[in-house]
Amino acid sequence: MNQNFFPKIHSLAISLILILCCTTVHAQKKLNVVVAGLNHDHVYQIMNSYEKGEVNIVGISEGDANLIMRFKKRYNLPDSLFNQNLSLLLKAKKPEVVLAYNAINDHLAVVEAAAPLGISVMVEKPLATTVKQAERMAQLARQYQIHLLTNYETTWYASNQEAYRKTKTNNEIGKIRKMVVHDGHQ
C-alpha cells in the first residue's frame, strides 16, 4: 500500500473535523449527514451538534433496537430518520457525508455502500481491522474520488481547538515555522 496515503488521510480527517467543529457557525448551509451506527461514544459529538442545530442528520442506519430507542428518547428523533439498510438510506437521502460510528469490522461495508454514490465517509479509528480491508477502502476512495477520513479523537480536544483558534483564526502568535506535537492516549 502507498505509504503516503495514510498521512494524507490523516490530514483530510483533521481538516474535516476542524471544518465541522470550527466553521459551522459561519456556514451558510448545514452539512447533510447520514450516521452509520450508534455504538461508538464519539457519536455523541455529532448528536450534540444536531441538537444545537449545527448539522442536519438526514438519516441513521442502526440495527440495534435498544440503541435506536435510547437515541430516539435522548435526542427526540423521529422514526423517519432510521433505516437498517444503509444502501437504501444513502440512495434516498443523498447526504454529503456518512459518519461511521459502527464496529470497525463494518467500516468497509459503509465505504462499499457510499463510495459508488460519490459520498465521502468518515470512520472512527482505526480505519480497518486488516490491511486487506484498508486497501480495499483506499481503492474505492480513489476509484470513486471520495474523501475517506479517519477520526482521531485528539483533534476534538478543547486544547487542540484552542491552539487552532489562536494560531489560525486569531493569528495570535504569527507564522509557524516548526511544530512538534506530543499528543494522544492509550
Regions found by a protein language model. Name each.
Residues M1-Q28:
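Bacterial Sec-dependent N-terminal signal peptides
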Residues N56, S120, H147:
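Residue-level detector of anion-binding/catalytic polar loops
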Residues L77-L140:
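Beta-loop-alpha module in the N-terminal Rossmann-like domain of NAD(P)-dependent dehydrogenases
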Residues N39-H42, H107, S120, H185:
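Histidine-centered active-site/metal-ligand motif
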Residues G59, E96-V97, K178:
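Short, Asp-centered acidic motifs that coordinate Mg2+ and/or phosphate
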